């Protein structure tokens, strides 16, 4: 793990805490019936999305806490099976319970960031996928989760409202992923995609928008 960019961490934390507040404001207005209704993600209700965001925050907290001790922690100690069980366990809770648990997990994670020292930010942790990542990347990864899933909730928040910081950083990552997954000579995005506004191009890339003349994007 290299030396973290503390100013970039600051910007990601600022953007993520704002996204957290929007998520909580939206969640506070949802009824039990709203949470049972489908989200834009196949097979997931809105309750599944919120419960995933709750579990995701707790997992990131575990990574940060372990890094603060100089250890490499697991986001989901039981792996992807634990992650998937955790999403189901609580997705059907009453709205007040689910949102209270979401709020608690958000402030648990933010508290880890606000108390974080050099040891924590220099550390690394293991995602549910098994990939090892710098803890300094966690605020950005959480920003991505909250931003995209706010759209997935199907409550009227489109990609047009995604924060500029997220769009800029994720476009860079998606372009690198595209280049790495295509053979020589096909490493550039399709010309039609390059004609799109940045936010729509990103929404297409992560499969949150369909565009005439383009196949479905590769997704996250």
For the regions a protein language model found, what residue spans apply to each?
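Short coil/turn segments at secondary-structure junctions
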Residues: 3-7, 40, 86-94, 130-133
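Amphipathic alpha-helix face/heptad-repeat signature
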Residues: 12-19, 52, 98-101, 105, ...
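Structured surface interface patches that mediate subunit assembly and partner/cofactor docking
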Residues: 1-12, 65-75, 115-220
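Conserved alpha-helical segments that form or flank metal/cofactor-binding pockets of metalloenzymes
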Residues: 47-79
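An N-terminal domain-cap segment
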Residues: 2-51
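A structural signal for well-ordered alpha-helical segments within the folded catalytic domains
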Residues: 17, 21, 47, 54, ...
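Structural signal for well-ordered, non-membrane alpha-helices
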Residues: 20-28, 57-61, 103-114, 147-150, ...
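A short, structured beta-strand-centered segment in the mid-to-C-terminal lobe
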Residues: 82-105
């Amino acid at each position: 793990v290299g030396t973290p960019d503390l100013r970039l961490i600051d910007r990601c934390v600022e953007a993520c805490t704002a996204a957290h507040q929007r998520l909580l404001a939206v969640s506070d207005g949802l009824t039990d019936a709203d949470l049972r209704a489908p989200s834009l993600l196949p097979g997931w209700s809105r309750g599944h999305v919120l419960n995933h965001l709750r579990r995701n925050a707790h997992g990131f907290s575990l990574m940060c806490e372990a890094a603060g001790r100089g250890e490499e922690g697991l986001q989901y100690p039981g792996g992807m099976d634990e992650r998937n069980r955790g999403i189901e366990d609580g997705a059907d809770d009453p709205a007040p319970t689910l949102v209270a648990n979401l709020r608690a997990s958000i402030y648990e994670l933010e508290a880890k960031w606000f108390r974080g020292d050099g040891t924590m930010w220099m550390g690394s942790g293991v995602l549910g996928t098994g990939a090892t990542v710098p803890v300094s990347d966690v605020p950005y990864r959480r920003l991505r989760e909250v931003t995209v899933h706010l759209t997935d909730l199907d409550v009227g928040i489109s990609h047009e409202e995604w924060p500029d910081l997220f769009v800029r950083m994720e476009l860079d990552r998606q372009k690198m992923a595209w280049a790495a997954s295509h053979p020589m000579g096909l490493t550039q995005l399709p010309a039609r995609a390059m004609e799109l506004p940045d936010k729509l191009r990103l929404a297409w890339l992560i499969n949150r928008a369909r565009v005439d003349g383009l196949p479905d994007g590769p997704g996250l």
